[in-house]
A protein has these predicted regions:
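A short glycine-/small-residue-rich loop at the edge of a beta-strand within enzyme catalytic domains
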Residues: 58, 82-83, 265, 269, ...
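Hydrophobic alpha-helical bundle architecture
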Residues: 111-115, 301-385, 389
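Signature of multi-pass transmembrane helix bundles
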Residues: 1-53, 93-302, 310-312, 355-363, ...
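Membrane helical hairpin/interfacial module
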Residues: 45, 49-96
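Mid-membrane cores of alpha-helical transmembrane segments in multi-pass membrane proteins
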Residues: 71-77, 97-103, 122-130, 150-153, ...
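Membrane-proximal extracellular juxtamembrane segment immediately upstream
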Residues: 56-57, 64, 68, 382-393
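Generic preference for flexible, low-structure residues
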Residues: 52, 65-68, 83, 290, ...
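Hydrophobic transmembrane alpha-helix bundles
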Residues: 56-59, 73-74, 92-93, 183-189, ...
Length: 466
């Protein structure tokens, strides 16, 4: 059975998800041609996103490597990037069974009415496998690994329910969809607290600029396309050791700028493919459940945050944070992690932050900045345990994507930089008995609160409809 799940996971998101969505579509009553088209569009979306992400990584890579060499930015933790982190997570004993375990937990929570999210974003289950894997290798106990993964899953489902109304209101065409992805959800506490603090600053409301406001105020210069070109050229220039080298490298500098601009322009177009493919599945699933089960109003289908990473504010803020993050990684005392490969996944910080800031570019930037500063220290602290897992997987599989260069430890912003990952790890591993007890109380408390909240909302709606 373990080999079966490893084979399915090994297909990759671009193959696994179209198959799953096609089968799911047929099972819920969609005709095969329409279900197949939906599945294939999802697959095309994943391929397109992979191509654009690879373009971003391959374009930035040489310039960033030169910056590291010129300015002596050597740090001790090698950035694996989220694809390698996912490969490590899924190739452990926890990862091999994470999908059926989490689906079982999801079903149990639906039956007990402690969630209304049906999480079909199976590829992103690797996040739960990740926290489970590092706890497993740290404690040498697979049961604690599954415990950590399950706790993370329960908390994430409740968070998805709690944030669903604001998410659906902020983003277009997202009715009935929630985001049960722990990396995105882990930044919600940062966003709520910092957003309220910023609102208390006199005059800060005058900086209420969203992506449309940038376009109106700065015209072409406020477009993500133009900002991508400018920042790309800036990074390319910083990768030169002298003015003469800058002049000699003008073609490559301009080329990097155009490629960065292309990434900013292509990502929204690619995310539209996800929406086109997933909407029929989402709508049909909600209709079927509404017919079969009473009191199913408000049900949400758990989808990938890739649906909304093309929002202009996300693109602009992510782009601005790339050079800032590199600078901070170098100057922050005690940090040993230099993010390079992880920068391509910067977009995934913001899907759940934007509904809280209402798309405000300044607020989103500040929240992202604080989250990244804290996240760099989280990655640094968890690197040793992630390295244990990566080395074990490499020894077993020989997969070069999980190989850590000699003399380095391994790390990745996604998922190691999140408060949820760091907190669950230390409460499970460092505090032994009292920590797991706290997590059980927290997870059960959130689930019970969620049930009470949803029951009250149902009662209010019933009264309003009379």
């Amino acid at each position: 059975m373990e080999e079966v799940f490893k084979y399915i996971i090994g297909l990759g998101a671009e193959v696994m998800m179209p198959i799953i969505f096609t089968i799911l579509g047929v099972c819920i009553g969609i005709k095969l041609p329409k279900a197949l088209k939906s599945g294939l569009l999802v697959g095309v979306g994943f391929v397109g996103l992979s191509v654009v992400t690879a373009l971003l990584t391959s374009s930035l890579g040489p310039a960033l490597s030169k910056m590291v060499e010129i300015y002596g930015l050597e740090l001790g933790i090698f950035d694996m990037g989220w694809p390698s982190a996912a490969a490590v997570a899924y190739n452990t004993s926890v990862g091999a069974f994470i999908i059926p375990v989490c689906l079982g937990i999801n079903l149990l929570m639906l039956l007990t009415k402690t969630t209304r999210t049906v999480n079909i974003d199976l590829w992103n289950y690797w996040h739960f496998a990740f926290i489970g894997a590092i706890v497993y290798f740290a404690s040498d106990n697979i049961y604690w690994g599954f415990f950590a993964a399950i706790i993370c899953y329960i908390i994430t489902l409740v968070m998805a329910d709690l944030t669903a109304p604001a998410f659906q209101k902020f983003y277009d065409k997202m009715d009935g969809i929630s985001i049960p992805q722990p990396f995105c959800q882990s930044f919600v506490p940062f966003a709520i607290v910092i957003n309220k603090l910023l609102d208390k600053i006199p005059g800060f409301d005058k900086l209420n600029i969203d992506s449309e406001g940038l376009k109106k105020k700065f015209g072409l210069m406020g477009e993500p396309l133009f900002l991508g070109i400018v920042i790309g050229c800036g990074i390319g220039a910083l990768g030169c050791g002298s003015w003469k080298e800058v002049v000699d490298s003008i073609p490559s500098i301009l080329g990097l700028g155009i490629k960065m601009g292309a990434v900013m322009e292509l990502i929204p177009r690619i995310t539209s493919l996800f929406i086109e493919g997933l909407k029929p599945i989402s709508d049909a699933t909600r209709e079927l459940i509404a017919k079969k089960y009473k009191n199913s109003a408000g049900l949400s289908i758990g989808m990938s945050p890739a649906l909304v990473i093309g929002h202009p504010t996300t693109l602009v803020v992510s782009l601005l944070l790339i050079p800032v993050t590199i600078f901070l990684a170098v100057i922050l005392p005690g940090n040993r992690f230099l993010p390079l490969a992880s920068l391509a996944g910067m977009f995934y910080l913001f899907p759940m932050i934007l509904p809280i800031t209402k798309g405000n570019v300044v607020k989103s930037f500040i929240i992202g900045l604080v989250a990244l500063i804290v996240g760099l220290y989280f990655v640094t602290e968890l690197a040793g345990f992630f390295t244990l897992a990566a080395k074990d997987v490499y020894a077993a599989t020989g997969d070069p994507t999980v190989n850590i260069p000699a003399g380095f430890e391994g790390g990745a912003l996604d998922f190691a930089s999140s408060l949820l990952c760091w907190g669950i790890f230390h409460l499970t591993y460092s505090l032994k008995i009292i920590g797991p007890a706290i997590l059980v109380v927290l997870a059960l408390g959130m689930a019970i609160y969620n049930r009470i909240r949803m029951t009250r909302n149902d009662a209010k709606e019933a009264l309003n409809n009379k």
